[in-house]
Each structure stands twice: as structure tokens, then as C-alpha cells.
């Protein structure tokens, strides 16, 4: 039996099938861990979601920011749904939309297998969160998503504020937890998320750190596998294994085997992307580079503007939605 973690699919159905063939996935004995962002931008989001749903007995899924945005869109009126991008619109108007969205809503923000020694999240963790604390906070939001009041949560999850504090309550608390699990890249030593910095380490504003390199962070008792940050490429450092390699942006789709002592990485090329012509930019003053140790593989292509494959959200959500 093999256990494979797979990076952000983002609606790249054909490429997902190619990766499953390459790792020789056998549903009779293998298990897949999907790191979130199953949908959006790849053009085959409905097919991708149906595929992962069909594998639900043989897989584990954590929710990404794009998945939460899809759930929020699904909870709106049909008139509003017809204004979103075609890739997501096909899902919310499909005949089996209720089956797919009800199943997606039951998925996790964090998955832990202590026997295997791994935790899976989509984006990041607060610097002071142990894995036990992360599980507890994930369950708080999961219970709301899976309960009868989930529509109110989906309407109130948008926005950058407040930053995490143990004393938060209500939707402020839920929003802060969601932002950490699904939107985090850089933060301050106090755990304040910087949502505007999305590029590779060394390009961020002074005083910000990759969430897994923040000074004073707690030591964690599990290895972590995550996605979300395609600008990193394949990055293995500080017990964190970041495997979003930008398949939707022309990078690669990555699988990491979790049940072996020796790391095994399998990749397939991402979708073909034609880069738009861009006007020359004025040189930018280099920012202070934060020192780091990491193992890199093929870098996810990003979207050409240094934000690691996180272009402006589709016209579906108010404010700075979790679609980034």
C-alpha cells in the first residue's frame, strides 16, 4: 500500500489523470492525500471535482481557498452564480452540484495521521500552534461548515482581519483560522499574515518570514505537507514539504510518497500556458533576503507577476476573498 500526497490540482483534470497513471495508483490498496485547491482556473474543474469525489473512499482532502470560494458561490443565488468565471460556473450549475458541494463541505482544514507521522494542510500554521492546537482549531471551523449555519460562515469568511488571537470569538475567530489554514505564506514573528506578499522568499517586505521559518516558532512533532504557494516550487525545509508546483500555471503537478523513509517525488508537466505580452517594468530595488535552507525541484511557473500563481480572484466574491 502506498500513500501519496498531491499538490494543487486547480481544475487540471487531464494532468491529474496523467499523474495517477505515473504513480500507478491502485484504488484497491493505495491512498491519496489532496492538499486542497481542487478547482479553479484549469478549465476542467467540474471533471476534476467529479474525479476526486469518485475516489472519496480512497483519499483524504483538505480545503483550500479556491474550494472555500466555490462553496461560497454555491450558496448564492443562481443570478449571482452566472456572473462567476465559466470554470466554476459549470460546477454550480451542474446536475450533480448538490452531491459534489455537499461532499466538499464535509472535508477538512487539517488532516493528521500520527501513525504515519504526517499532517496535511493547504497553506500554513500560526507560529505558536502545535499540531494538537492546529487540529483543535481546524475542527472548530469544520463543525461550522458541516452544520446548518454554514451559509452564514461562508458569507462572513472574507477579509484579511483580524489577525489570530486566542481570545477571538464568533466569525472573527473563524475568519482568522481560515486565513491561516488556506491563505498564509508570509507572516510576522507575532503571526500577522501578509496577504500582499506572494512571491519567492527574498522578495518579501522586511520583517516578514515564510510561515515555516518564523523566529520563535514552536517545534512540531509531525512532518507537514502543504500546497498553496506555487512560487516556492518543490520546497522541503524545516519539516515542511510544500508541493504546489504550479501545474495550472505551466509548472508541474507533484506527488510525494508519504509512507517511505526515503523521499520519493513524482511529477508530470502542467498545462500549457501562453504567456501574455507584458510591458517592460522599471527595476525594483532588491529587498533584504531572509536566509533559508531548502531542497528545490521544478518551480511552479506562477503567473508572470511574481505572485506565485495567485492572480486576481474571479468576480465572484466580495473583497479579498479566499480565492487568491
Curated annotation (Swiss-Prot):
Q: Which PANTHER family match?
A: CYTOCHROME C5 (PTHR40942:SF4), PTHR40942
Broad enzyme group: hydrolase
Which SUPFAM superfamilies has this protein been placed in? Metallo-dependent phosphatases
Q: What GO terms fall under cellular component here?
A: cytoplasm
Cite the Gene3D superfamilies for this sequence.
Answer: 3.60.21.10
Source lineage: Bacteria, Pseudomonadati, Pseudomonadota, Gammaproteobacteria, Lysobacterales
Q: Name the Enzyme Commission number(s) assigned to this protein.
A: 3.6.1.41
- Say yes or no: keyword Ion transport present: no
**Biased amino acid composition, Basic residues:** 282-297
Gly residues composition-biased segments: 298-309
Protein name, as recorded? Bis(5'-nucleosyl)-tetraphosphatase, symmetrical
The record ties this protein, via CDD domains, to: MPP_ApaH (cd07422)
Domain of life assignment? Bacteria
Catalyzed reactions per annotation: P(1),P(4)-bis(5'-adenosyl) tetraphosphate + H2O = 2 ADP + 2 H(+)
Q: Where is this region: Disordered?
A: 269-324
Give a yes or no for keyword Ubl conjugation in this entry: no
Molecular function (GO) terms for this protein are: bis(5'-nucleosyl)-tetraphosphatase (symmetrical) activity; phosphatase activity
Keywords in UniProt for this one? Hydrolase
InterPro entries linked to this entry: ApaH (IPR004617), Calcineurin-like_PHP_ApaH (IPR004843), Metallo-depent_PP-like (IPR029052)
Q: Which Pfam families match?
A: Metallophos
Q: Which organism is it from?
A: Xanthomonas campestris pv. campestris (strain ATCC 33913 / DSM 3586 / NCPPB 528 / LMG 568 / P 25)
Q: Which family does it belong to?
A: Belongs to the Ap4A hydrolase family.
Q: Biological process GO annotation list?
A: RNA decapping
Q: What does this protein do?
A: Hydrolyzes diadenosine 5',5'''-P1,P4-tetraphosphate to yield ADP.
Mark out the compositionally biased spans (Low complexity): 310-324
